UniProtKB/Swiss-Prot annotation:
Thylakoid as UniProt keyword: no
HAMAP family: Ribosomal_bL27 (MF_00539)
This protein's UniProt keywords: Ribonucleoprotein, Ribosomal protein
InterPro entries registered for this protein in UniProt: Ribosomal_bL27 (IPR001684), Ribosomal_bL27_CS (IPR018261)
Entry annotated with the keyword Ribonucleoprotein: yes
SUPFAM superfamilies named among the record's database cross-references: Ribosomal L27 protein-like
Organism for this UniProt entry: Blochmanniella pennsylvanica (strain BPEN)
Protein name (database record): Large ribosomal subunit protein bL27
GO term, biological process aspect, one: translation
One term of GO molecular function: structural constituent of ribosome
Location of the region described as Disordered in the Swiss-Prot/TrEMBL record: 1-20
Pfam families, sorted: Ribosomal_L27
Membership in a protein family: Belongs to the bacterial ribosomal protein bL27 family.
Cellular-component GO terms for this entry: cytosolic large ribosomal subunit
Amino acid sequence: MAHKKAGGSTRNGRDSHSKRLGVKCFGGECVSSGTIIVRQRGNTFHPGKYVGCGRDYTLFALKSGKVLFEKRGALRRKFISIVS
């Protein structure tokens, strides 16, 4: 006979891989065309001048220059632009 009672099973013990989201190039940093600036879920940051937006809301540089973070509009939305 067993001298220990059987242990119960658990429904925990899983976790998803991190998605490596966030700002990849910060304000004042020089970037070349096509460089990813931000990976995000939804529009936390909005594309400004010379910044494109991918279908997963990734922001990337459309031309070479320096990254500029700014707040614009009545809602004070965060925009990212490329300045030369």
